[in-house]
Amino acid sequence: MFRLLTACWSRQKATEGKQRNVTIIVIGLDNSGKSHLVAAFQRLIPSKMHSEMRPTQTTLLLDDYQVSVYDLTGDLKGREKWPNYYAEAHGLVFVVDSSDIARIQEVKIILTRLMFDKRVSGKPILILANKQDKKDALLPCDIIEYLLLERLVNETKSMCRVEPCSTIRNLPKRHQQPIVIGLRWLLAAIGDRYDELCTRHQTPSMSNISSSKNIRGCGERCSSDSLSTRGVGVVRNNHRQHFEKRQHLEHRQHVEQRHFEKRQHFESRQHLIQRSLDARPLKPILQKDGFRIRPKKNMSVTFALDVIMEEGECSRKIGAPNISKPCNSQCYDTKTPAPSADANLFKARRPKKRIETWDTEEMFLEDPRGEAFRSCVTGHSSRSSRNTQSLYFTG
């Protein structure tokens, strides 16, 4: 029994001597599921409890590694503190909400900036496509295509792996195994380059560096060189964030201007359509098209003889006296009704219509008081036929 206990104790000491201390930071946008991921790590992997109250720091024991996991917030203020932990981390876990397609462009910008940072370039990165349980979640192949991971990996010389996962508490453990598989891959990639990564690891620890609200606890001050480096990095990140905010604001203003112009065009078009449907008088339309309109006139037509034969007047050609005497000087006037309003104003005026000739003999015979002049008319019937006059319309 003593030998058995001695063998177990010696084996535990050898295992503790081989354990490697690894620091990993978990980052991503807000509401991507980072806190649920760390909770899943604690459920699936044995963890080591600390006496200090550090809710954002978790220590895991997996294989031959003692892993310190730091959960960093993903809001705008929390992202400003990310560069303070790049140099201390051996590897990174980047959590992506695969169901939020609207923010995939924002994820692309942040991940590109992260991988091109000198303190992160060359370090292994595990990308977890979280919330795969949702209906519209993107597949890992789609995420690789959207984020252009192949180009980023080739340019930054960083190892990268995309693993689908879901961090729901009620999900069975067998469906949460991709989380453990991804973490094992990350630790194996760190173990292959552990010595190289440790040389890049700066002497101050994470607890000493942190002075923000993300990680609690008081620590020592950083060295002047590391502080100046971080100050330059923070200034650059502030400039980049200011530039991105300005670009986003300009793009939003451009989109609003386009919507305003489209709305104005639609309203003007509706106004023109409404005007075309409204009833308008005909006169302005015709005057606009160049038509000439004549005013209406109430015209009367008078029928009359061109020449009135008086008593004792003879024929001009023969010279014989005319003894015929008209019984009365009646003029046959008839008034035509005024043209109606519906008459076509644009028709040409009709030519004067020639009326059939009237025989004076017939006129006198119809007159009862012309009996006294029958003899004269009978004697000069041939002459009177020549003296018949024509009637015209006079306007």
Swiss-Prot record:
Cross-referenced InterPro entries: Ciliary_GTPase, P-loop_NTPase, Small_GTPase_ARF/SAR
Matching Pfam families: Arf
GO cellular component: ciliary membrane; motile cilium; non-motile cilium
PROSITE patterns documented for this protein: ARF
UniProt keyword terms in alphabetical order: GTP-binding, Nucleotide-binding
Binding positions (GTP): 28-35, 71-75, 130-133
GO molecular function, one term: GTPase activity
GO biological process: non-motile cilium assembly; receptor localization to non-motile cilium
Family to which the UniProt record says this protein belongs: Belongs to the small GTPase superfamily. Arf family.
Protein's UniProt name: ADP-ribosylation factor-like protein 13A
Native species: Rattus norvegicus
